[in-house]
């Protein structure tokens, strides 16, 4: 028996386990690449796997017997993909940290262009601080969490960046904009969360509109 993975390396890998045919099959994988693979990114197996060996137990260094692999009646690569697709991940601390940090980065990136205060975009540090006051980020749907956070930040006095539109003005359009945005000289500003309804109304009423390039607020000054 040999141990191809020492304890130091195991800190940076996750184990994916598939139980089938009354047996156990395991792969040692890099958590960040597994996350990308399972979220639809085209990732080569060589980047996902710490080694392409299929184990009975990664932690003990026990390799799966050839007879156990023959039960699949498939190629080695096909077996590996089945384990990756259908197995469950024994998440390491590194995996949990990576997923949490990735979700946080996605949310910050979404909100950076949607939130202002006093006419200025927030620095990343200020935005993270504001988010921390209203929401505990968890690993999950980044877009959904961003919408929840945005609504909470508005109640704290932050401004939601709107959609700048040139539109053929009518009584119905004017009424909608008054309730869900602002009328300016030559264009209207629609709240971003109300824009889907604005678009539907224009299409239904056959009103032409054009989304204009947004005048970017200045970035927050860092002193």
From Swiss-Prot:
Keywords: Cytoplasm, Ribosome biogenesis
Organism (species): Encephalitozoon cuniculi (strain GB-M1)
Record's GO cellular component terms: cytoplasm
Localisation per UniProt entry: Cytoplasm
Pfam families assigned to the protein according to its UniProt record, in alphabetical order: SBDS_N
Similarity remark: Belongs to the SDO1/SBDS family.
Alphabetical GO biological process terms: ribosome biogenesis
InterPro entries: Ribosome_mat_SBDS_N_sf, Sdo1/SBDS-like, SDO1/SBDS_N
Top-level division of the source organism's lineage: Eukaryota
Protein name: Ribosome maturation protein SDO1
Its job: May be involved in the biogenesis of the 60S ribosomal subunit and translational activation of ribosomes.
């Amino acid at each position: 028996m040999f141990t191809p993975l020492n304890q130091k390396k195991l800190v940076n890998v996750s184990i994916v386990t598939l139980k089938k045919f009354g047996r156990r099959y395991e792969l040692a994988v890099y958590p960040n690449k597994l996350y990308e693979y399972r979220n639809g990114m085209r990732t080569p197996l060589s980047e996902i796997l710490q080694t392409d060996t299929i184990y009975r137990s990664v932690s003990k260094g026990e390799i799966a017997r050839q007879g156990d692999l023959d039960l699949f009646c498939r190629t080695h690569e096909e077996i590996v993909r089945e384990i990756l697709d259908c197995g469950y991940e024994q998440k390491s601390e590194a995996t949990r940290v990576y997923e949490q940090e990735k979700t946080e980065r996605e949310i910050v990136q979404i909100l950076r262009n949607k939130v202002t205060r006093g006419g200025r975009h927030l620095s990343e540090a200020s935005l993270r601080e504001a988010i921390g006051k209203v929401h505990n980020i968890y690993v999950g749907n980044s877009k959904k969490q961003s919408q929840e956070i945005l609504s909470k930040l508005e109640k704290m006095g932050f401004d939601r960046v709107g959609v700048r539109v040139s539109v053929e003005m009518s009584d119905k359009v004017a009424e909608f904009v008054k309730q869900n945005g602002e009328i300016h000289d030559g264009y209207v500003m629609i709240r971003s969360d109300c824009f889907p309804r604005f678009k539907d109304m224009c299409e239904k009423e056959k009103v032409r509109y054009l989304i204009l390039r947004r005048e970017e607020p200045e970035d927050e000054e860092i002193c």
